[in-house]
A protein has these predicted regions:
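Conserved active-site loop/cleft motifs that coordinate metal ions or position small ligands
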Residues: 32, 210-213, 252-259
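Active-site acidic/histidine proton-transfer and metal-coordination neighborhood
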Residues: 78-175
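Short, electropositive alpha-helical surface patch
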Residues: 82-95, 120-132, 157-167, 193-199, ...
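Acidic/histidine-rich catalytic cores of soluble enzymes
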Residues: 133-229
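Conserved, mostly hydrophobic/aromatic
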Residues: 23, 71, 89, 100, ...
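Active-site beta-loop-alpha junctions enriched in small/polar residues
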Residues: 7-11, 36-38, 73-75, 113-115, ...
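N-terminal pre-domain/capping segments
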Residues: 1-70, 78-95, 281-297
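Acidic (Asp/Glu)-rich catalytic clusters
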Residues: 20-27, 47-69, 94-104, 132-139, ...
């Protein structure tokens, strides 16, 4: 079964229930959210009543809580060797894992981090040490996201992810989130997704892939830019992304859209329809703007 959804907001007054309602309005059967702003440490207390109502509504709509994912905030950088920033990142990630547990969500997506000039190997060592401190304290599975290689990002190659995972003690609590834009910008050919998956399989990592971020890219392959584009409107292209979404080896894995808003309006309902129909809609952007404008009148 196709599991398709998008990033949605997690708001103070509605929390998980509100995130679910928005996802359902897009025609989603999975979704992703941050438990607070990704750029700061401000976090609201989790409301158990809202969580319970959301869980009931998920069952009514045949949505499995196991298919919902949380994204860790960007300010966490496990690769940074600066002692105070490193300790902050470890402690904050532990808190985020705990929030996932309270919500009943078992997967947390993490950008591995940036080595900030210390070198990839030092960055990888820092990430491994941090994960070996964090994972024994949580039931949450941390999914390392494939990165575009912007700046000093770690995790830009499959081999770097392999090295991190090999160093982690509790391997059952570590996984991978593919990002199609990041892979393409990192110089992988999304048009040959099977070769990419063959490489994961060669390293015994295929079963570690637990989520896919489906994004087109504004930039050409190997650009190391990380600028997402709407499905079919970028350099990767609609057919190549459809081949990822419907690839048999990625079946039953949540596919999450993180594509940009169009003039302030969410594109996800129409993008999901397009994906389900497997037919590119070259008028999608205009239609999103029209629907959004009509609602605001």
């Amino acid at each position: 079964m196709l599991k398709i959804g998008s990033h949605v907001s997690f708001k103070k007054d509605t929390q998980l229930l509100g995130a679910l309602d928005v996802a359902l309005s897009y025609g989603s059967n999975t979704f992703m959210f941050y438990t607070g702003a990704p750029q700061n440490t401000n976090r609201v207390d989790l409301n158990p009543d809202l969580t319970e109502k959301a869980l009931i509504k998920m069952k009514e709509n045949n949505i499995n809580i196991k298919d919902i994912v949380v994204h860790a905030p960007y300010i966490i950088n496990l690769a940074n060797g600066d002692e105070s920033k490193y300790k902050f990142s470890i402690n904050f990630l532990k808190q985020e894992c705990k929030r996932c547990e309270v919500l009943g969500i078992d997967k947390l997506i993490l950008h591995p981090g940036s080595h900030v000039g210390q070198g990839v190997e030092v960055g990888i060592k820092n990430i491994i040490n941090a994960l070996n401190e964090i994972l024994p304290t949580t039931k949450t599975t941390i999914l390392l996201e494939t990165m575009a290689g912007k700046g000093s990002e770690v995790g830009k190659t499959i081999e770097e992810l392999k090295e991190i995972i090999e160093g982690v003690s509790e391997k059952e609590k570590i996984g991978i989130c593919l990002d199609t834009c990041h892979l393409s910008d990192g110089d992988y050919d999304i048009g040959d997704i099977d070769s990419i998956l063959d490489t994961f399989e060669k390293y015994n990592l295929l079963s570690k892939i637990k989520c896919v971020h489906v994004n087109d890219s504004k930039n050409i392959k190997g650009s190391h830019k990380d600028r997402h584009e709407n499905i079919g409107f970028g350099e990767i292209g609609f057919e190549n992304l459809i081949n990822v979404i419907y690839n048999k080896r990625l079946e039953n894995i949540p596919k999450i859209l993180e594509t940009p808003y169009i003039e302030g309006f969410a594109p996800y309902k129409l993008e999901i329809e397009m994906i389900r129909n497997k037919k590119f809609n070259d008028k999608l952007k205009e239609e999103v703007i029209k629907i959004g404008s009509d609602k605001n009148e």
